[in-house]
């Protein structure tokens, strides 16, 4: 029987991994031995999420309630469950995808932008923007301070609420990055009462703001399958389904794997690979021309648009023709836009540089823009892993002697250094259903 032709996503996955394998200058025997070892380790051996229970969000949950769940559970993302299916052994029927906090806040900003545009042209009805959205978010996005803004949420209320409310404001007095990482307890208290939040469900934005499919593995699956999904197949997290049951038992993220690798320091196989300079491993797996960056004088919304369009989580902020790095922004930094009401009211004209400076001014003792995480081509993979794990970040930028950005190393890239895909592993292990969901 003829083999089905591969789709564009499959070709992209293959091209990435083939590039990785061709650039790694490691003994083939070492790679085969290590890959075989990962293939024998069951997923059930990986540490469980804190508390031992994976938090799930029903698809008919409102955006406000979803944020409340994420906030109270201190997590950034959660599987979305189909509330219409109570009892089933088929995970395809039970789960619809994964929602994360950054996607929700991105939706908030885009909703505000649409409402503001509608208000500025007097065409809210024609644009299909509800009275709540236009009167509240739109007025705030335009910087209104009169009755229109007061009739909805006040500027201060939205700024504080979306940023994380009192928790974030208290955190700002200590450390701004920490504040941005705390979801805050008051966000949901405000948006539960306002449109379009209280009538918009998680299901309605799940498809448009989902960057990766929902592909679980079984508890008796191998860690190799998880590592391949998190690297070659570009997933950021992999749900673990209990065998014979559709319930999720664990939730393995790229970050968790990197922290796991960091704890392997001292083991022969890890030290053998991590002692190599990143250049010997072919890192970064891109050319300087392929780096997606943003100039410091561009609008901050353009930076977030580039992230969404390219499905990447962060960008280096550069200046000049040599692209000298002066900072970085990530999709999670959207929350910083909302830490201060004056930022939110002017976000449509705010430059990346002003955005970074405003954040820096709120950080005690320094008052300076936080230096982005960088490395040189001669640094070891071990030092890169340590930097990523200890700073809890998702990427590190490779720079030359002139501090110009020459590449980016992501968690996906690091995981790819330790494995390769055995022949026909994907076809034999995951089967057609997973191929279809991955878009292969």
Language-model regions, residue ranges each:
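Tandem CBS (Cystathionine beta-synthase) repeat/Bateman regulatory domains
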Residues: 1-440
């Amino acid at each position: 029987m003829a083999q089905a032709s591969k789709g564009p996503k499959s070709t992209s996955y293959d091209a990435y991994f083939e590039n990785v394998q061709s650039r790694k200058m490691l003994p083939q025997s070492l790679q085969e031995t290590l890959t075989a070892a990962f293939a024998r380790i069951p997923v059930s051996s990986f540490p469980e999420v804190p508390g031992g229970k994976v938090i799930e969000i029903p698809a008919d949950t409102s955006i406000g309630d979803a944020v409340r769940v994420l906030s109270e559970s201190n997590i950034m993302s959660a599987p979305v469950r189909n509330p219409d299916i109570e009892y089933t052994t088929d995970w395809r029927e039970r789960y619809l995808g994964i929602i994360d906090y950054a996607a929700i806040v991105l939706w908030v900003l885009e909703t505000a932008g649409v409402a503001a545009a509608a208000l500025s042209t007097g065409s809210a009805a024609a644009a299909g923007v509800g009275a709540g959205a236009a009167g509240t978010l739109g007025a705030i996005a335009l910087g209104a301070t009169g009755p229109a803004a007061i009739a909805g949420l006040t500027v201060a209320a939205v700024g504080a609420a979306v940023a994380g409310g009192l928790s974030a404001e208290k955190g700002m007095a200590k450390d701004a990055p920490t504040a941005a990482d705390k979801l805050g307890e008051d966000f949901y208290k405000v948006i539960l009462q306002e449109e379009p939040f209280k009538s918009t469900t998680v299901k309605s934005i799940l498809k448009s703001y989902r960057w990766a499919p929902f592909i679980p593995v079984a508890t008796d699956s191998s860690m190799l399958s998880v590592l391949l999904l998190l690297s070659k197949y570009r997933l950021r997290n992999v749900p673990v389904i209990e065998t014979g049951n559709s319930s999720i038992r664990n939730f393995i993220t790229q970050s968790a794997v990197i922290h796991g690798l960091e704890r392997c320091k001292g083991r022969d196989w890890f030290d053998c690979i991590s002692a190599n300079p990143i250049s010997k491993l072919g890192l970064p797996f891109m050319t300087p021309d392929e780096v997606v960056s943003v100039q410091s004088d561009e609008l901050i919304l353009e930076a977030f648009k580039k992230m969404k369009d390219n499905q990447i989580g962060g960008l280096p902020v550069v200046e000049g023709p040599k692209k000298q790095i002066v900072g970085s922004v990530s999709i999670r930094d959207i929350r910083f836009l909302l830490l201060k009401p004056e930022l939110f009211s002017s976000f449509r004209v705010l430059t990346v540089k002003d955005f970074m400076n405003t954040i820096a001014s709120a950080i005690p003792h320094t008052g300076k823009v936080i230096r982005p995480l960088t490395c040189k081509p001669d640094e070891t993979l071990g030092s890169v892993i340590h930097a990523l794990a200890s700073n809890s970040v998702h990427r590190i930028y490779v720079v030359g002697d002139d501090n110009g950005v020459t590449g980016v190393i992501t968690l996906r890239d690091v995981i790819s250094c330790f494995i390769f895909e055995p022949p026909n592993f994907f076809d034999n292990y995951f089967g057609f259903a997973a191929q279809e969901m991955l878009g292969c």
